[in-house]
């Protein structure tokens, strides 16, 4: 009896799921990872969140990126469910400029104010990710992919900012914020 149960457990553990339709598993995960990496607006904002969190330091270093990812997932679920959220595209564009300015000007608000600002913008980005998902893509895998890609972009911003701070090159962080503002202006003008 023990051998039968052990064999059944091994066979169960060794099996892989069979999907009757394409777009599940690895394909969905890859689509989720790719989505934030294919838009300059998304890249700029997600790196800017990391930059701003590193400028603030302490709790903001993890609270602000975690807020963005968490609220973005809520927005993604709303988008996938086709729940309308007003002003998504203008909100995304405003987020590029606003977060770039917050970094460029080294604005230092209380952590909860940053959470509110970041949360509002994350809803827009998440909704865009969710609304643009293909019908044949698995939602959980897709959302996992875009959450990991987003967290990675935050980590890039944090890593850059912390490296610049250690090298006494804090103005480089603020310059990166100014680049975000320019990206936002370029997107608004239609040249990017």
Stretches found by the model and what they are:
Residues 2-192:
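Membrane metalloprotein/metal-transporter helix-bundle signature
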């Amino acid at each position: 009896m023990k051998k039968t149960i052990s064999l059944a457990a091994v066979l169960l553990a060794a099996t892989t799921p069979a999907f009757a339709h394409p777009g599940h598993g690895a394909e969905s995960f890859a689509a989720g990872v790719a989505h934030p990496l294919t838009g300059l607006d998304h890249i700029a904002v997600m790196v800017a969140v990391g930059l701003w969190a590193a400028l603030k330091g302490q709790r903001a270093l993890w609270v602000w990126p975690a807020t963005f990812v968490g609220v973005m997932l809520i927005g993604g679920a709303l988008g996938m469910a086709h729940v309308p959220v007003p002003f998504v595209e203008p909100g995304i564009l405003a987020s590029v400029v606003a977060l770039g300015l917050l970094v460029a000007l080294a604005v230092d608000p209380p952590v909860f104010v940053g959470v509110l600002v970041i949360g509002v913008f994350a809803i827009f980005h998440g909704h865009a990710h969710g609304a643009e998902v293909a019908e044949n893509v698995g939602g959980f895998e897709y959302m996992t992919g875009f959450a990991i890609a987003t967290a990675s972009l935050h980590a890039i911003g944090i890593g850059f900012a912390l490296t610049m701070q250690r090298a006494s090159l804090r103005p480089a962080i603020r310059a990166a914020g100014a680049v975000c503002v320019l990206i936002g202006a370029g997107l608004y003008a239609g040249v990017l």
